[in-house]
């Protein structure tokens, strides 16, 4: 194998391969990236046995061939080269990396590609075309609410469902819930929901372009994303996702509206002095005014306390709500509206956070005790 290629184009794709590979030590074939030169293309593939990535880039193929090489060191070597083009040559069991007309040479040990896994087949799945902007929005609104508790693996991913041509994504950690629904560009067959790991969603999200669409395909064991010459697959998480519909309030009796940026900036300041273990912040709402405080009125804080008032649209009775400020801050960062609305019936029961005007997503937040 011998190829001549653009450094940045090659580096971009092997860096994605590096993200996929979990094991950064050169101990197995799964620490390697596959390079296959054929025709006028170089195919690049990487896997950690659960997530698989594949793409092809145009190169000048001087001699066809296939090999695998330790991905982490390959990225480091290519990054260090000073030229716009690089030459890769397979010599017996070594990949020689050199820039044209430069007295620089790196040799990396290779492993045979014979035992390297193929890209998983997606036969028998259901498919839906989704605009890339919608998919990015769905990922951004859900990944932060996924549970990190490994003993509850069934909520360690985002629940994805197709209903009447729409795609619905839901995530929860047991104390909050994120919900977003988008219309697909094509309608799939009947389908029961699956749980998609956050790792594949994060990698795909970083590769999405502003325009175009993504073909999302789901089989009994895998999820696939196809777009812009990229192919991604991931093993699904097994288990029964909780019945999230039971925790979504049918109706909230009271609500208040507040500027999104104003609330976000106030949270950032007041949270500097909240108790770091619980992240609890206190919100006092009264007519026309919202007060954020790092402590309750009856508490003493060893470090100190912070308080900030901002205007809000509210006409009900005065109430105090305590909650984990991160559960409010993280959705505010991904909303793009000027205002948000917080709906509630009782300060001790679930709150609903929405954009104003109302869109196709909302967040449910369980409050904390005020004392």
Curated annotation (Swiss-Prot):
Its main location: cytoplasm. GO terms for molecular function: 3'-5' exonuclease activity; DNA binding; DNA-directed DNA polymerase activity. It comes from the Bacteria. InterPro entries: DNA_clamp_sf (IPR046938), DNA_polIII_beta (IPR001001), DNA_polIII_beta_C (IPR022635), DNA_polIII_beta_cen (IPR022637), DNA_polIII_beta_N (IPR022634). The keyword Nuclease does not apply. GO terms for cellular component: cytoplasm; DNA polymerase III complex. It is found in: Cytoplasm. GO terms for biological process: DNA strand elongation involved in DNA replication. Keywords: Cytoplasm, DNA replication, DNA-binding, DNA-directed DNA polymerase, Nucleotidyltransferase, Transferase. Confers DNA tethering and processivity to DNA polymerases and other proteins. Acts as a clamp, forming a ring around DNA (a reaction catalyzed by the clamp-loading complex) which diffuses in an ATP-independent manner freely and bidirectionally along dsDNA. Initially characterized for its ability to contact the catalytic subunit of DNA polymerase III (Pol III), a complex, multichain enzyme responsible for most of the replicative synthesis in bacteria; Pol III exhibits 3'-5' exonuclease proofreading activity. Forms a ring-shaped head-to-tail homodimer around DNA which binds and tethers DNA polymerases and other proteins to the DNA. The DNA replisome complex has a single clamp-loading complex (3 tau and 1 each of delta, delta', psi and chi subunits) which binds 3 Pol III cores (1 core on the leading strand and 2 on the lagging strand) each with a beta sliding clamp dimer. Additional proteins in the replisome are other copies of gamma, psi and chi, Ssb, DNA helicase and RNA primase. Belongs to the beta sliding clamp family. This is Beta sliding clamp.
């Amino acid at each position: 194998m011998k190829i001549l290629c653009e450094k940045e184009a090659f580096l971009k794709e092997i860096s994605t391969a590096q993200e996929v590979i979990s094991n950064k030590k050169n101990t197995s074939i799964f620490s390697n990236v596959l390079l296959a030169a054929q025709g006028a293309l170089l195919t690049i593939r990487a896997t950690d046995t659960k997530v698989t990535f594949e793409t092809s880039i145009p190169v000048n193929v001087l001699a066809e061939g296939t090999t695998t090489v330790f991905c982490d060191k390959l990225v480091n070597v290519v990054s260090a080269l000073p030229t716009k083009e690089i030459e890769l040559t397979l010599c017996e069991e070594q990949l020689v990396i050199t820039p044209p007309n430069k007295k620089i040479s790196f040799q990396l040990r290779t492993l045979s590609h014979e035992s390297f896994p193929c890209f998983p087949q997606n036969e028998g799945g259901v498919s839906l075309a989704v605009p890339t902007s919608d998919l990015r929005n769905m990922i951004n609104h859900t990944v932060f609410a996924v549970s990190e508790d490994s003993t509850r693996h069934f909520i360690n991913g985002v629940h994805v469902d197709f209903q009447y041509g729409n795609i619905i994504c839901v995530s929860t950690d047991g104390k909050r819930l994120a919900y977003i629904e988008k219309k697909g560009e094509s309608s799939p067959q009947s389908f029961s929901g699956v749980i998609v790991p956050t790792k594949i969603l994060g990698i795909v999200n970083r590769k999405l372009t502003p325009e175009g669409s993504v073909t999302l395909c789901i089989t009994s064991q895998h999820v696939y994303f196809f777009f812009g010459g990229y192919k991604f697959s991931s093993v699904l998480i097994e288990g029964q996702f909780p019945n999230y519909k039971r925790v979504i309030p049918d109706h909230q009796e009271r609500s208040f509206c507040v500027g999104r940026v104003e609330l976000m900036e106030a949270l950032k300041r007041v949270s500097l002095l909240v108790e770091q273990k619980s992240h609890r912040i206190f919100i006092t709402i009264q007519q026309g005014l919202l007060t954020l405080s790092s402590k309750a009125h009856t508490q003493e804080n060893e470090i100190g306390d912070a308080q900030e008032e901002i205007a809000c649209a509210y006409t009900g009775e005065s109430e105090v709500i305590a909650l984990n400020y991160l559960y409010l801050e993280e959705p505010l960062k991904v909303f793009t509206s000027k205002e948000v609305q917080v709906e509630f019936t009782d300060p001790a029961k679930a709150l609903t956070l929405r954009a104003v005007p109302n869109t196709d997503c909302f967040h449910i937040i369980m409050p904390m005790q005020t004392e």
